Regions:
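Aromatic-lined substrate-binding rim segments of carbohydrate-active enzymes
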Residues: 87-177, 240-258
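Bacterial N-terminal signal peptides that target proteins for export
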Residues: 2-13
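Extracellular structured ligand-interaction cores
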Residues: 61, 98-100, 142-146, 200, ...
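Bacterial Sec-dependent N-terminal signal peptides
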Residues: 20-44
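Active-site groove signature of glycoside hydrolases
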Residues: 171-237
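Catalytic-core regions of glycoside hydrolase
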Residues: 40-84, 139, 217-302
Length: 302
């Protein structure tokens, strides 16, 4: 038995030594490409790349974002806090690691009145002041912007939809968050769709710019703007496919220079809860959205 154990340890040690040698070779500081194979094949182009091994690379896969908002919970000293962020490595500047400021906000905060938007200097609402503070700070720190809009008021303490939409005759439903009654338009309502498209058109005119915007996350419908558990005017899911076609067509038409994202999950535009949804329907919608130019993302992962 002892002999078997000794042989096993000996074999393991040899494997570790071999692995160590391999790793040492792979991590060599010699940057000159060495090969005994000739790539000089007719029609090929040879490209030699010298690896950068010492400089910090920011967020290589671009999946990690710096979350922010423009609602009442946002701090006006946001940048001071994030430039002096306590971490396990000591005080760090968050923008040294991330390259995207992700701004989530209620449609009503982005668009408080018809034709009035937070990026207009004439708009002096508190959300507008927060928005401009965030945008200016992002520019100073060489960060691009990303956005999610929220049209559904459930779980909110104020209406996510601007008042002028309801005043224009859009139909919707009322829910209660704590002691506050909030109103949400039905996503299949034609007046809501007209007004939301007008907002998206104005937003795209300003932010369909790859030098400024990293991505725009669709669609803004359902809980948290993430297409969860929608309530349609019919009381069932009959409008689901038509709403999908409408919102994907609008966003793919307006955002032609920056990535548009779809929140992928089993409840996509469904009126049902998680366990009751048909995953095949959601999977088909994801494929169709991708065919229209959408990318995939999930707020659980960035």
């Amino acid at each position: 038995m002892n002999k078997i154990i000794k042989n096993s340890i000996k074999t393991l040690s040899m494997c570790l030594l071999a692995t160590t040698s391999f790793i040492g070779t792979a991590c060599s500081d010699d940057d000159a490409p060495i090969t005994d194979y000739s790539w000089n094949i007719e029609g090929n182009t040879t490209v030699n790349i010298m690896p950068e091994r010492y400089q910090l690379q920011r967020n290589l896969m671009s999946g990690w974002v710096i979350y922010a908002g423009i609602g009442s919970g946002m701090m006006m000293d946001f940048w001071d806090l994030y430039d002096n962020f306590e971490s396990s490595e000591g005080t760090v500047k968050v923008s040294d690691y991330g390259n995207t400021l992700y701004v989530r906000g209620l449609w009503s905060n982005f668009n408080p009145e018809k034709g009035k938007y937070v990026w207009d200097e004439s708009v002096q609402t508190e959300p507008a002041k927060r928005f401009r503070m965030l945008v200016e700070g992002a520019k100073e720190r060489n960060l691009k912007l990303a956005f999610t809009f929220v049209c559904d008021s459930r779980d909110k303490h104020e209406d996510a939809c601007p008042d002028y939409v309801k005043e224009a005759g859009a139909e919707g439903f009322t829910t209660t968050t704590g002691s506050v009654n909030v109103w949400t338009p039905y996503p299949d309502d034609p007046i809501f769709q007209r007004e939301y498209e007008e907002f998206l058109t104005a937003f795209a005119a300003k932010y369909n710019d790859p030098d400024v915007t990293q991505f725009v996350s669709g669609f803004g419908l359902g809980k948290w703007g993430e297409t969860h558990t929608l309530k349609y005017s019919t009381g069932d899911e009959a409008p689901r496919q038509a709403v999908f076609e409408w919102i994907t067509d609008v966003m793919s038409r307006l955002f032609t220079k920056v990535p548009i994202m779809i929140n992928y999950h089993r409840c996509l535009l469904s009126g049902k809860e998680f366990s009751d949804t048909d995953t095949d329907v959601a999977a088909d919608m994801v494929k169709r959205a991708v065919a229209k130019g959408f990318c995939l993302r999930h707020d659980a992962f960035g």
